Structure formats: C-alpha cells, structure tokens
Amino acid sequence: MTSKINKIVNGPIPDSFLFDESKRLDSLKFDGTNLEVLDQLLLPHEFKYIPVEGVSDAFAVIKSMQVRGAPLIAVVGSLGLLLEIQKASELDSESIIQKINFLISSRPTAVDLRNSLNGLKPILESQDYSDVVKLEKCRSYLLNVYTDEKLQNRILVWNAYQELLSAFPDKEKLTVMTICNTGSLATISWGTALGVIRALHSENRLKLVYVLETRPYNQGIRLTSIELLHGEVPFKLITDSMAAWAMKNHQVDCVLTGADNVARNGDTANKIGTYMLAVLCKHHNINFYPVVPFTTINKNIATGEEIKIEERPSAEMLRVNGVLIGNSECPVWNPAFDVTPAHLITKILTDFGNWPPEMLEQQIPK
C-alpha cells in the first residue's frame, strides 16, 4: 500500500530529520507477540503500560479512551485482532468479520480504524486463496498496518514541514497554535500536527506553540503539554476560550490540527473546538492546516454532512479526574468532534502531497 501513495515533497528525506527518538514518548510497546499500551487516562500523573491480549482488550482501551488518536487506535485495533489470529489454527472468516465490525464500533467517527480493518475483508471474501493462505495474508496485512504507520508518518511530517517552509519563506521562526493531542501519544511515531511542530523545533524554526487545553477531555493539558515538556519545546498552555484573544494580540502564523475523518471534498472532522479555530483563522487571516495521513481520508463520503459525530457521556464534562465539578443533574450535550468545512481550510497536508481542499478528491490515491 505504501508504495502507491508515497509522494515526498522536496525529497529525499534526510537521515537527520527527526532522528533523536529519545525526545519522544511511546504510546505502545509491541514485540511481535505481546502488546502493551500506555494508559493515557492516567497521564500526566502516572505512566503505566497495560496489556492488550486480543480483540476484547483492544475494544476496551479504545472505547474508554485509554488510547486515542485516529492513527493509534487503528494500530491498536489491528494488533489486537492480529494477536487473536496468530493463535488460530484455522480460518473462521465469519468470526473475524464480526470482530472487525465490533472493533470499528468502538469509535465510530475515527475512520482510520475502519479503513485499516475493512482492508481485511477482500482477503477473507476472496475465492483465489485457500484458508491457510488467507490466514497468513491476514496476519501479514495486520502487521503491515503497524509497520506502514511508522513509514507514512515520517513522510507526512516531512511533507507538512516543507509546506510551512514554502508558505512562510521570510520568517525564520513560526508561532503555531494547536488543539487536542496529535503527537506520539496519538500515533506510534512523531504524530501528525504535533509531529510537524516537533520537526519545526528540531530544525530551529519554531518560536512558540499555543496549546489549547481542549475541554472536556483535556488532551491539551494532560497529553500535549507533557510531550512538549519532554521534548523541551517552547509552548504556552491556554484555555479554549482564549484562542481568539491570543490570535488578536500575538502573531500566530498558522494553526495545525489533526483529523479523524476527512470527506472527499475536504470537509474535516476533528476534536470538538477545531471548527471554532478555523472560523477564527478566517477572521484573523491565519493559515489553517489539518495534517492528515492517507488512512484518515474517507473515500466513501462526499461531504462532512455524512460524517457520524460520536457523542460522549455527560460524566466526561461534569467530572475531572473523577471529581464532580458541576451539578450531577445538569443536562449535557457532549459531541466529541466537529466538522470544519473545506472553504475554511488553507491546505490539507498529507503523505501524498499538500493540497487545497478543492483538489483533494482528484489527488486521493486509488
């Protein structure tokens, strides 16, 4: 799959680019037969890796948001299924398809998980292979989800970094704003938007990052801040409601976000609050860039109107670390995502090039 979609901007990528992995936190540990994931609900107070032994465990850690981030949950779901298939002595296609659908239901908005797991179905439904060959092909495919993510993430970060150099040729260092967590805790490599920020810092092209706390789940303050502290990246944490004032009073050059689901026309679903940032960027004439791997493109939907928005429990808004901060009887609306319309997006930065939204559909690899 990777060879079909690679489009490296201003390549080749130098070996020195983001070579120091000691500055990176690891979201999981996998040795081929054992999988452990970092329990992100315990961060920043405790770093604890918990075992994932199969599909049920993978579903649980994804559903509970012990792991989160579209690329990461795709890998965890795939490896959870791989661990079960590795133990199987014979193929049970119907059971595997049931497990695929079960895993996909854990986070319905995040398309990476769906895209990755649905890629198994043509193998299972093929009449060209014996059951023994199908089983081996399934194992190989699921392992490749893990290995491909590392390769594609490096290309994605490089391409996006090159776009920023081109967009701001007269600026030595950039001031960037971001939301949620899109770094190594959301992927198995450097990350999407935060990976680009880490690249800017490593190349001495970053002045400052404004990090939104990202209510109600606080991924900015709990996760992004510890990644940036660990990497010694200059940043300031702000509340979500401070974004407009920060844009007005400080020179924010661009906003970089991740994405969980991108329609063919470029409409982009991401963490709730992203649409707000895009509207503010339009008003303040600031570039707005989603940083998006190929696996996040949803070729099955034409516009953002078709994206199903997950709604989370009211307790996630009313409680912080288990402590009730509002009346337990408060009525709550808690969508996990919003959709930014394509016309508010400067470019969508991908591992197959950097594209204005209106050009995305014709550039999506087949």
From Swiss-Prot:
Function, as annotated: Catalyzes the interconversion of methylthioribose-1-phosphate (MTR-1-P) into methylthioribulose-1-phosphate (MTRu-1-P).
GO biological process, one term: L-methionine salvage from methylthioadenosine
Protein's recorded name: Methylthioribose-1-phosphate isomerase
Annotated site location: Transition state stabilizer: C180
Gene Ontology annotations for the cellular component aspect, listed alphabetically: cytoplasm; nucleus
Domain of life: Eukaryota
Catalyzed reaction equations: 5-(methylsulfanyl)-alpha-D-ribose 1-phosphate = 5-(methylsulfanyl)-D-ribulose 1-phosphate
Entries under PANTHER family matching the protein: METHYLTHIORIBOSE-1-PHOSPHATE ISOMERASE
Family of the protein in this entry: Belongs to the eIF-2B alpha/beta/delta subunits family. MtnA subfamily.
GO molecular function (one): S-methyl-5-thioribose-1-phosphate isomerase activity
Keyword annotations of the record: Amino-acid biosynthesis, Cytoplasm, Isomerase, Methionine biosynthesis, Nucleus
HAMAP family listed in its UniProt record: Salvage_MtnA
Pathway: Amino-acid biosynthesis; L-methionine biosynthesis via salvage pathway; L-methionine from S-methyl-5-thio-alpha-D-ribose 1-phosphate: step 1/6
Main location: cytoplasm
Stored Pfam families: IF-2B
Subcellular location: Cytoplasm; Nucleus
Protein source organism: Caenorhabditis elegans
EC number, UniProt record: 5.3.1.23
Catalytic site: D260 (proton donor)
